Amino acid sequence: MDSPAAAGRPTGRVVLVGAGPGSVDLLTLKAARLLAQADWVVHDALVQPEVLALATRAVLIGVGKRAGRRSTPQAEIDRTLVDCARAGGLVVRLKGGDPLVFARAREELDALRAAGIPVEVVPGITTAQAAHAALAVPMTERGRRRAVVLATPQVHAREPEHPAAGGSDLQWARALVNAGGGAVYMAATAVGRLRAALLSLGLPAGTPATWVANVSLPGQAVVATTLGALAPLPPALAGQPAILLLGTAAATPAPVPSWDKVGDRARAVGHAAIEH
């Protein structure tokens, strides 16, 4: 594996970088700088083209993982990162949201360290935070919400918690019930199981449940309901990335900002900072 930008260089380094929830305007300045400097960018399927466009000198390698679609095996992603680093230069492993939140970071960090590859992590705005911001609903409130729960009902078949292994996959549900709600990642393909588990553990059927799809993007959509009436996303949003907020009442969501139209002045300031 050879890269013109990395020719003749010693073994490179890998940086796990958070791409944020979607909009390029929610990317951190450090993430943008690293993309501009990168020789290789190994990116998730949901990373937006506007974000990838910042990697002007890099070889782009897509390693998508999306429900219901062909996914790149984790072992293959690990090998790709090691191979790119050994070819030399800067490798950016670009992950949607924050690289340490439901992003398989542990496997990649372990593989890189085992191979003797220097690695670091740059945080990003996680989808739960961006979704609450879009609704102008605080994630914590004095006297009301003292805990933040980020959960997922997705359990790998090889994990001991999986029912097929004789375990229970309700740890995530108990955490949500104990906190009275939270943010649920990758919930769209597990609606029935999620609803049944939470109701069986005592979360009230009237608990507000809000889907936020395409968070921070022009096609952002909000579907407000309750846990008892929770249903899959409507057909128009089927297959779109979405997060479920439980216990978050948003009967009248705040106006959704048009992240693609934040203004040339803001973009110019950001690009000037990146260049320096």
Where are these regions (language model features)?
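Class I S-adenosyl-L-methionine
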Residues: 1-125, 130, 229-231, 237
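A contiguous loop/helix-start segment that scaffolds small-molecule binding in enzyme catalytic cores
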Residues: 2-4, 10-14, 86-91, 104, ...
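Short hydrophobic/aromatic-enriched beta-strand-loop microsegments
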Residues: 59-65, 118-120, 139-146, 202-211
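Residue-level signal for well-ordered alpha-helical positions
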Residues: 54, 134-135, 197
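Short, basic, helix/turn surface patches
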Residues: 69-75, 142-159, 235-242
